[in-house]
Amino acid sequence: MEKMHITNQEHDAFVKSNPNGDLLQLTKWAETKKLTGWYARRIAVGRDGEIQGVAQLLFKKVPKLPYTLCYISRGFVVDYSNKEALNALLDSAKEIAKAEKAYAIKIDPDVEVDKGTDALQNLKALGFKHKGFKEGLSKDYIQPRMTMITPIDKNDDELLNSFERRNRSKVRLALKRGTTVERSDREGLKTFAELMKITGERDGFLTRDISYFENIYDALHEDGDAELFLVKLDPKENIAKVNQELNELHAEIAKWQQKMETSEKQAKKAQNMINDAQNKIAKNEDLKRDLEALEKEHPEGIYLSGALLMFAGSKSYYLYGASSNEFRDFLPNHHMQYTMMKYAREHGATTYDFGGTDNDPDKDSEHYGLWAFKKVWGTYLSEKIGEFDYVLNQPLYQLIEQVKPRLTKAKIKISRKLKRK
């Protein structure tokens, strides 16, 4: 096994084709990390010109100290049963990490627990310290240890039927409601950032500046690994649909009124049907007024939600999502999610990753809503083997490990105070 010098394109091709590859190991992802002070180095090992393993090493300075942390996010990308390749990757990583004055090498492989026996054993044998099997969104991890993934390698009907029943009904309703899902361009990031600000204010979290999303889009869109989707509501088109539904409801009432006059047996049923239709008419009249007001103010329509969809080979990722407070009954997010899944499938993806979660948290948990949303999309829990540290400077590592919990608690307190404002 030997060190190899490969191009960025060769690195990315290996990551995208390897079952343990991940978005965070793509070379263009490292470009997105520069804004937050990270810089990258890359390594590869192989035999007879054939690549056996790669890794993208991210480095960040420790504040006020001449040291760095080496972080291999969702790496190494290698067959973890191949001890020789794994050992060669570690040797290469140590060489670079020491040159960059790293106090530790941290990895969190994209390897699931039920397939991770070799990885766990071989990493520990090499001297890696396992950080344990904590909850998916534990503050002790950089990346979530658990994510929710929908298999999308199936036709439209099979995909829809894989969703939980109530969610399936909502998707079907969303498709009828009259929103349009657009695959947007860079200009659409302005709208997305505005929606993200609204979402943050509603849900109580700090949001990123537009430059953050532009950075991701600029780095990954050219290779087809980042797409922006926006959901639009056209008032004129939907007023026409509401008028059609109102006409149908009035016709329905006339039909049941006629039955009431001709059949005493059906009188009770007819009255119930009439009452139901009248309730629907009242709701549609309210909706029509709202749409007419919208048409006066925004005749071109408004955007209700948006998302960034990412790719790494056969894996797709719902990275960021945002939505308006208006016209939520149109279920724009349901229309968008189903559309993005189909788009991802059509562009070679077999899985759709909703991102981090805990495993079936209690209803009073701050993470319950996140889990409840993600579980209804035909997802399974992807539980990773977690983080591992290879210590290069034991005294500094111990010091930072002792200080880190206090910093985490301080960040949580600040975050909670901001939420209450």
Swiss-Prot record:
Cellular localization per UniProt: Cytoplasm
GO MF entry, a single one: aminoacyltransferase activity
Keyword terms, alphabetized: Acyltransferase, Antibiotic resistance, Cell shape, Cell wall biogenesis/degradation, Cytoplasm, Peptidoglycan synthesis, Transferase
InterPro entries: Acyl_CoA_acyltransferase, FEMABX, PG_Glycine_Bridge_Synth
Catalytic activity: beta-D-GlcNAc-(1->4)-Mur2Ac(oyl-L-Ala-D-isoglutaminyl-L-Lys-D-Ala-D-Ala)-di-trans,octa-cis-undecaprenyl diphosphate + glycyl-tRNA(Gly) = beta-D-GlcNAc-(1->4)-Mur2Ac(oyl-L-Ala-D-isoglutaminyl-L-Lys-(N(6)-Gly)-D-Ala-D-Ala)-di-trans,octa-cis-undecaprenyl diphosphate + tRNA(Gly) + H(+)
Enzyme nomenclature, EC number: 2.3.2.16
Domain of life: Bacteria
GO biological process: cell wall organization; peptidoglycan biosynthetic process; regulation of cell shape; response to antibiotic
Predominant cellular place of this UniProt entry's protein: cytoplasm
GO cellular component: cytoplasm
Catalytic class of the enzyme: transferase
Function: Catalyzes the incorporation of the first glycine of the pentaglycine interpeptide bridge, which is characteristic of the S.aureus peptidoglycan. This glycine is added to the epsilon-amino group of the L-lysine of the membrane-bound lipid II intermediate (GlcNAc-(beta-1,4)-N-acetylmuramic acid(-L-Ala-D-iGln-L-Lys-D-Ala-D-Ala)-pyrophosphoryl-undecaprenol), using glycyl-tRNA(Gly) as donor, in a ribosome-independent mechanism. Involved in methicillin resistance.
Family under the similarity heading: Belongs to the FemABX family.
Subunit comment: Monomer.
Name of the featured protein: Lipid II:glycine glycyltransferase
